[in-house]
Structures are given as C-alpha cells and as structure tokens.
Amino acid sequence: MLRHILGLAKKHPSLIPLFVFLGTGATGATLYLLRLALFSPDVCWDRNNPEPWNKLGPNDQYKFYSVNVDYDKLKKERPDF
C-alpha cells in the first residue's frame, strides 16, 4: 500500500500535498482519540471504581481548551463522598 502511494506521488507530484494533509488529519484524529481515552474523566477503564469523576478536584483541568478560567484559584464547592 505504501509503495503504491509512493509510486503515485512520483508519477503525480501534485498529489503530495493531499497525502500530507490526509496523513496529518489521520494522525491528529488518532492522537485526539487517544487523549480522550486516557485523560477524560468520562471514560472508566477500572471496573473497581464505578465513579471516577468523584476523584477530580475543582482545580483539575480536563477540558481541551479553556479561555478565561484559572484552575488554581477555584474553591471546592462540593461535599466529599
């Protein structure tokens, strides 16, 4: 498969940007799914802990991007379980 793509790139050099953008998009999508699977509190890989979101504190950042929130200055406003 890779030889076929390289052969096409040698025959038609105008396809090289297409292959680069497709590869970049596929790599980005894979890395984003890996980030969601490993660092999201909504995903639980441990069956012994059915509620993993209770371990998160108010100053744990798990959003991908937050604009104006300083997580170090947030106070705890929920009870301990």
From Swiss-Prot:
Phosphoserine modified-residue sites: S66
Residues in compartment: Mitochondrial intermembrane: 38-81
An annotated GO cellular component: mitochondrial inner membrane
Modification type N6-acetyllysine: residues: K10
The keyword Membrane is annotated on this UniProt entry: yes
Mitochondrial matrix domain ranges by topology: 1-14
GO molecular function, one term: protein-containing complex binding
Membrane topology: Single-pass membrane protein
Keywords from the UniProt entry: Acetylation, Electron transport, Membrane, Mitochondrion, Mitochondrion inner membrane, Phosphoprotein, Respiratory chain, Transmembrane, Transmembrane helix, Transport
Keyword RNA-binding tagged: no
Location in the cell: Mitochondrion inner membrane
Annotated TM spans: 15-37
A Pfam family recorded for this sequence: B12D
Coiled coil: none
Physiological role: Component of the cytochrome c oxidase, the last enzyme in the mitochondrial electron transport chain which drives oxidative phosphorylation. The respiratory chain contains 3 multisubunit complexes succinate dehydrogenase (complex II, CII), ubiquinol-cytochrome c oxidoreductase (cytochrome b-c1 complex, complex III, CIII) and cytochrome c oxidase (complex IV, CIV), that cooperate to transfer electrons derived from NADH and succinate to molecular oxygen, creating an electrochemical gradient over the inner membrane that drives transmembrane transport and the ATP synthase.
Subunit structure: Component of the cytochrome c oxidase (complex IV, CIV), a multisubunit enzyme composed of 14 subunits. The complex is composed of a catalytic core of 3 subunits MT-CO1, MT-CO2 and MT-CO3, encoded in the mitochondrial DNA, and 11 supernumerary subunits COX4I, COX5A, COX5B, COX6A, COX6B, COX6C, COX7A, COX7B, COX7C, COX8 and NDUFA4, which are encoded in the nuclear genome.
Family: Belongs to the complex IV NDUFA4 subunit family.
Protein name (record): Cytochrome c oxidase subunit NDUFA4
Organism: Macaca mulatta
